[in-house]
Amino acid sequence: MGVFVKLGAEYFSSAELVFYRSLFGLVVIYLIIRLQGLSLATPNLKMHFWRGFSGFVALMLFFYALSVLPLATAITLNYTSPLFLAMFTTVMLREGPRPLLIFTIILGFAGVVFLLRPTLHAEQLNAGLLGLLSGFFAGIAYLNVKQLGAMGEPEWRVVFYFTLFCTLGGGIWMLFHSFHA
């Protein structure tokens, strides 16, 4: 996906790329849901909102980073999401800080810094921070997915509401920014 976003970023904004990616996925998952006669009703709409919001922000930031930074750099920054997820589960789910986990999280971030130091130029610092934030928000989104699963939400419903949120969010964002025909 990263390669296609990088290529598409020459012609489309991040909001447009998120919108079109999500719209296609929304249509497909909606058709599957309807063909199988599944229900979209959920008692966990608030949690779906937070999962959609965090995933949308992560996707927007990731697509922006892909448009500005070298492909490998943007992907490396986004791939910090498991490190953030490990931190979130320790704090938010009260899984307790284990010394080995803390050490591996620090080691993981040190590795990211080591990998990026020679490739991230001063003028790319803001884009780099936004790319890192994409990993942060993706970690939150993954935590939300774990919580939704614990609430008994099926995967297809989680995917539907996420793509719906991203389609709406990307569409609204496009209204306030440049649009490419």
Regions found by a protein language model. Name each.
Residues 3, 30, 52-60, 82-87, ...:
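Hydrophobic/small/kink-forming positions within alpha-helical transmembrane segments
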Residues 3-6, 29, 121-178:
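Transmembrane alpha-helical segments that form core, pore/gating elements
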Residues 10-16, 61-78, 154:
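Structural motif at transmembrane-helix junctions in multi-pass transporters
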Residues 24-28, 77-91, 106-107, 165-169:
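Alpha-helical transmembrane segments of compact multi-pass small-molecule transporters, enriched
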Residues 34-61, 126-134, 181:
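Loop-to-transmembrane-helix transition segments
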Residues 60-68, 113-120, 166-181:
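Hydrophobic alpha-helical transmembrane segments in multi-pass integral membrane proteins
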Residues 100-117:
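Hydrophobic transmembrane alpha-helices of multi-pass small-molecule transport proteins
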